[in-house]
């Protein structure tokens, strides 16, 4: 049996997830039940994603919030609109503050995204549609794009 030296493990840099939660969830199914009969073709999905980061204290606690909105349409109807604000509280332990922006913008959103994706898939399925399976998101590419836009 191996033992872990607690003094060493506490000095190791790591991210602690203290909580994950739905802040806001809305699903509109405005054309039901007519829209449910018109599912013979794949709908067009318009997806938007935003990340909000809030410093909760001086002790490196942060809330990272994913704001995801998806609107599904076909030729006749707006099939559904779903909006989800899903957040996590993260504690960045023994991590240099210069690394905080990339961790909070890339790694933390990537940790909670699968849970938000599952909620959206379940809600759209419960609304009578095929579950909306959002493709994986490259948060690193989004971060670098945002940083290059700020530099210009």
Curated annotation (Swiss-Prot):
GO terms for cellular component: cytoplasm. This is Protein-export protein SecB. Gene3D superfamilies: SecB-like. GO terms for molecular function: unfolded protein binding. The keyword Chaperone applies. One of the proteins required for the normal export of preproteins out of the cell cytoplasm. It is a molecular chaperone that binds to a subset of precursor proteins, maintaining them in a translocation-competent state. It also specifically binds to its receptor SecA. It holds the Pfam family SecB. It comes from Rickettsia typhi (strain ATCC VR-144 / Wilmington). Homotetramer, a dimer of dimers. One homotetramer interacts with 1 SecA dimer. Belongs to the SecB family. InterPro entries: SecB, SecB-like_sf. It comes from the Bacteria. GO terms for biological process: protein folding; protein tetramerization; protein transport. It is found in: Cytoplasm. Keywords: Chaperone, Cytoplasm, Protein transport, Translocation, Transport.
